[in-house]
């Protein structure tokens, strides 16, 4: 069975946009760069040609990856999410039990994660610790800097 990749609608749209750009804009640009470099003659010492071929390889690899991700995407409609228990898509407000520092994270798909923007991957240690918990619960997360304890202050959706 094919493993589904959970993501938000916004994350899915971003993947589709990148796929379209790589197929319809980047691919033709690289093909043109290869043709132009090939016209310069000897390919064995043609740095432009080798750079363009490397760019082509990278682009085609990413296209394959994006096609796979979009085919396996399980788009979760966050507008239909609710409840007290934390699951994919939840926005969770936490307080560090040692420093009293408050943080808010939204649990999103791996491709959408951006810690600086407050979006953490569903497969991250903190998200895994949060899943199934609710307001008032405490969690302990083994982070690179050691173990951290958080209390869940708020769970919201959308």
Curated annotation (Swiss-Prot):
GO terms for biological process: DNA-templated transcription elongation; regulation of DNA-templated transcription elongation. The keyword Transport does not apply. PROSITE patterns: GREAB_1 (PS00829), GREAB_2 (PS00830). Keywords: DNA-binding, Transcription, Transcription regulation. Pfam families: GreA_GreB (PF01272), GreA_GreB_N (PF03449). InterPro entries: GreA/GreB_C_sf, TF_GreA/GreB_CS, Tscrpt_elong_fac_GreA, Tscrpt_elong_fac_GreA/B, Tscrpt_elong_fac_GreA/B_C, Tscrpt_elong_fac_GreA/B_fam, Tscrpt_elong_fac_GreA/B_N, Tscrpt_elong_fac_GreA/B_N_sf. It comes from the Bacteria. GO terms for molecular function: DNA binding; RNA polymerase binding. Belongs to the GreA/GreB family. NCBIfam families: greA, PRK00226.1-2, PRK00226.1-4, PRK00226.1-5. Necessary for efficient RNA polymerase transcription elongation past template-encoded arresting sites. The arresting sites in DNA have the property of trapping a certain fraction of elongating RNA polymerases that pass through, resulting in locked ternary complexes. Cleavage of the nascent transcript by cleavage factors such as GreA or GreB allows the resumption of elongation from the new 3'terminus. GreA releases sequences of 2 to 3 nucleotides. This is Transcription elongation factor GreA.
């Amino acid at each position: 069975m094919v493993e589904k990749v959970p993501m938000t609608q916004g994350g899915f749209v971003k993947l589709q946009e990148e796929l379209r750009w790589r197929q319809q804009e980047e691919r033709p640009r690289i093909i043109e760069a290869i043709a132009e470099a090939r016209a310069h003659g000897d390919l064995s010492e043609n740095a432009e040609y080798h750079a363009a071929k490397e760019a082509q390889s990278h682009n085609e690899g990413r296209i394959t990856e994006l096609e796979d991700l979009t085919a396996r995407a399980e788009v979760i409609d966050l507008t239909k999410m609710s409840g007290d228990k934390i699951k994919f898509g939840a926005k969770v407000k936490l307080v560090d039990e040692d420093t009293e520092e408050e943080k808010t994270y939204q649990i999103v798909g791996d491709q959408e994660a951006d810690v600086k923007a407050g979006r953490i991957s569903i497969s991250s240690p903190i998200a895994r610790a949060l899943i199934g918990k609710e307001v008032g619960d405490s969690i302990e997360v083994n982070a690179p800097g050691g173990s951290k304890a958080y209390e869940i202050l708020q769970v919201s959706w959308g």
